């Protein structure tokens, strides 16, 4: 995760130690100063994501890392980032819950929280991984998607993946695409509309505190960023926030498929559980698929929908199934 974030251009991290994600903060506290970045240990998870939002609007690629209880505390600031269209990355390494739960044990019970934890109607992008190589690739993709769609992106890993030790084939600089911040071409002294999308739907940014003065708020706002309750403006913004992701669902969503030809039964999984599931169905001669990227967007045809039986894991309460079928 750390190597992927640095490859993608991370320059600011704010966080609070919590098992099993603390290693992300520990390593970034050592590595960020070497690339001119900043690391801050905040007083809690609430202030951590707020600091990340501030760093992002000021022009830096920014992220935080947490788990279970800390992720719960971040939900309000996550909603602020959605409403303010602030690109950032939130890494959540899942552990047993609820409450303090099982801090050192693996779990995959935060799927619904990642998708629906923020109150109100919204869309969000969530990426998962099943290996160290996947973690690197998905972290780079997470930053790219955050910048492309001007939205927070959640990296939803689990404790086993978070503490996994595997070989990582590091790509050379430039080998993987890295999306840089789209900055406005509007010059100083000219009217700048921070929330007026271009014809292609993308929204250029101006570094906060720079040559343009504008407002950033968690309230519904107009193209200048000032709060409004005007129904037409509110409705237009809501549809924009959702459609900019869901309309691109086919470009965003991806999965890996294994042995699906003529399959009658399909197992769908993600994270560390996907590796075990794949091994079991392979050794028993069945067919399997697992989603490396799940949760959102939803409006994408599921590759398992054509098959008669579909088994989804992990978790007694079938959180993944609710979002897949």
Feature locations, PLM:
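Short, glycine-/Ser/Thr-/acidic-enriched flexible segments
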Residues: 69-70, 95-96, 131-133, 160-162, ...
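Thiamine diphosphate
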Residues: 1-116, 118-120, 123, 159, ...
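Conformationally flexible catalytic loops at phosphate/diphosphate-handling active centers
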Residues: 153-256
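Short acidic, glycine/serine/threonine-rich loops at helix termini
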Residues: 24-27, 51-54, 74-78, 99-106, ...
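Conserved thiamine diphosphate
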Residues: 105-159, 179-185
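Short glycine-rich or small-residue beta-strand-to-loop segments that form or flank ligand, phosphate
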Residues: 11-15, 62-66, 125-130, 264-269, ...
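Structural beta-sheet core signal
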Residues: 50, 64, 90-91, 155, ...
């Amino acid at each position: 995760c750390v190597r992927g974030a640095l490859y993608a251009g991370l320059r600011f991290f704010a966080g609070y130690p919590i098992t099993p994600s603390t290693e992300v903060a520990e390593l970034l506290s050592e590595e960020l100063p070497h690339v001119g970045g900043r690391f801050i240990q905040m007083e809690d998870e609430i202030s951590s994501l707020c600091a990340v939002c501030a760093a992002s609007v000021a022009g830096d690629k920014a992220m935080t890392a947490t788990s279970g209880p800390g992720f719960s505390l971040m939900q309000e600031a996550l909603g602020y980032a959605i409403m303010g269209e602030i690109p950032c990355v939130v890494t959540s390494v899942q552990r047993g819950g609820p409450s303090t739960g099982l801090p050192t044990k693996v779990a995959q019970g935060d799927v619904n929280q990642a998708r629906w934890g923020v109150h109100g109607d919204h869309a969000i992008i969530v990426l998962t991984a099943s290996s160290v190589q996947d973690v690197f690739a998905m972290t780079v993709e997470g930053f790219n998607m955050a910048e492309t769609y001007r939205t927070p992106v959640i990296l939803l890993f689990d404790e086993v993946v978070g503490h996994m030790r595997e070989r990582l084939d590091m790509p050379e600089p430039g080998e993987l695409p890295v999306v840089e911040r789209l900055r406005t071409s509007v010059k100083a002294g000219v009217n700048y509309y921070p929330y007026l999308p271009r014809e292609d739907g993308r929204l250029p940014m101006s570094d906060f505190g720079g040559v343009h003065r504008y407002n950033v708020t968690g309230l519904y706002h107009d193209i200048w960023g000032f709060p409004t309750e005007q129904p037409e403006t509110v409705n237009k913004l809501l549809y924009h926030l959702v459609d900019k992701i869901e309309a691109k669902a086919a470009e965003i969503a991806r999965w890996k498929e294994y042995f699906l030809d003529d399959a009658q039964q399909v197992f769908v999984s993600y994270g560390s559980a996907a590796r075990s599931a794949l091994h079991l169905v392979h050794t028993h001669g069945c067919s399997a698929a697992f989603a490396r990227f799940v949760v959102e967007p939803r409006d994408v045809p599921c590759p398992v929908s054509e098959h008669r039986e579909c088994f989804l894991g992990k978790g007694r309460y079938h959180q993944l199934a609710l979002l897949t079928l």
